UniProtKB/Swiss-Prot annotation:
Plays a role in peptidoglycan recycling by cleaving the terminal beta-1,4-linked N-acetylglucosamine (GlcNAc) from peptide-linked peptidoglycan fragments, giving rise to free GlcNAc, anhydro-N-acetylmuramic acid and anhydro-N-acetylmuramic acid-linked peptides. This is Beta-hexosaminidase. It comes from the Bacteria. The record marks D174 as: Important for catalytic activity. GO terms for cellular component: cytoplasm. Belongs to the glycosyl hydrolase 3 family. NagZ subfamily. The keyword NAD does not apply. Its EC number is 3.2.1.52. It comes from Yersinia enterocolitica serotype O:8 / biotype 1B (strain NCTC 13174 / 8081). The keyword Zinc-finger does not apply.
Amino acid sequence: MGPVMLDVASYELDAEEREILKHPLVGGLILFSRNFHDAAQLRELVRQIRAASHERLVVAVDQEGGRVQRFRDGFTRLPEAQSFAAINDAATAAQLAQDAGWLMAAEMISMDIDISFAPVLDIGHVSAAIGERSFHSDPQQALKMAECFIRGMHSAGMKTTGKHFPGHGAVTADSHKETPRDNRPLAEIRTHDMVIFRELIARRLLDAIMPAHVIYTEADARPASGSSYWLQTILRQELGFDGIIFSDDLSMEGAAIMGSYAERGQASLDAGCDMILVCNNRQGAVSVLDNLSPVKADQLACLYHSGQFDRQALMASPRWQQANKALTALSERWDAHKSRG
């Protein structure tokens, strides 16, 4: 299995995509809203992807909930992470967060999708890129909700990806559009943003981590996604993380400071990423495949889903029906809360 995760253009594979998926450096594929028409079409697309590749790929999606939910029609409307904090009863909030993790994972596994890149572990809501995707502005409250969500995902048979290490929540800039700079002292980042990562790693609840395309100026001139200081010295050595490290999408403007697409890919792997994402730019992806040093990433097989869900049986189950009803209601209440200002 190779270390590159790519995307495809539409509802089904074209001839060029079938050839690209056979490339030995390709190990994963991420799906977007443009790949989704309905559940039957999505299941067929995943079947085509599986058939086209020589080795089983890691098939991924961003199905966090709220504004980052690629598949909507026919799937449960998942609430924003921040909405759990608006529930007055702590036990109810914890149960709903766990239900959300389980239901999201079960619905994706029923499509033969291995992972959703979740949960978001950034602290606070000031960042344009994060906002309501964050569970809470208080690290301990965010930790409680994230742990519940993670346990739900694991109970369904899906691995977790904590993002965006060491924390994207304090910068207002959007790394999709520019390279944000976090000028805070390292001590503040450690005691505020990194607490949730440190605790979840210590509890062995994170299977993968995705670093931020953010420059932390007190630590390194490179974004964390291309920084051996953050990925090796801090994440691997200090925190003892032994899971998978993904880059965020290298087509984002936050990664452009690392050079051409090929240079971004090589820099991220050299810094310590196990798999790099190159999306929304076919020419850039081909450049990465043409220029990247040959490398295997067979450790990524640990990310395959271990659950089994038939879609019709899942949706007929009392657990799904109860969770679907409660989470849909929470989404609607949160929307009403926002509309009132």
